Amino acid sequence: MEKLRVFELREKSDAELLKLLDDLKQELATFRVSKVTATGTSKLSKITLVRKAVAKVLTVYNQRKKEEARKKYKKLSKTPLNLRPKLTRAKRKALTTKQLTMKTIKERKRAENLPKRKYALLV
């Protein structure tokens, strides 16, 4: 089992990734069985390599799925919570720029009818 490179995994299709994932899980299961039966001590160090390879494959696969979901919901007004940008609580609850610039009817009428006062200093 050689070390997997993520940039190589990104070039593979979803079907190839899932097949590779199944193979890695099978290999991991055999290593775990050999660990319990204590037949191959040389294989114990490979367990970590296989576990990390499984994690890499799953990471690439899940990132791809999430990116596809983002593209799907890009045009819609409401997106799922897990696809929204991760912000602090204060930034999520903050008013939007449109909400900040909104004025009441009274404020709008006052701004229209009463021009801003200009003060001139006499020198």
From Swiss-Prot:
One of its GO terms (molecular function) is structural constituent of ribosome. Keywords: Ribonucleoprotein, Ribosomal protein. One of its GO terms (cellular component) is cytosolic large ribosomal subunit. GO terms for biological process: maturation of LSU-rRNA from tricistronic rRNA transcript (SSU-rRNA, 5.8S rRNA, LSU-rRNA); translation. HAMAP family: Ribosomal_uL29. Belongs to the universal ribosomal protein uL29 family. NCBIfam families: L29 (TIGR00012). This is Large ribosomal subunit protein uL29. It comes from Theileria parva (East coast fever infection agent).
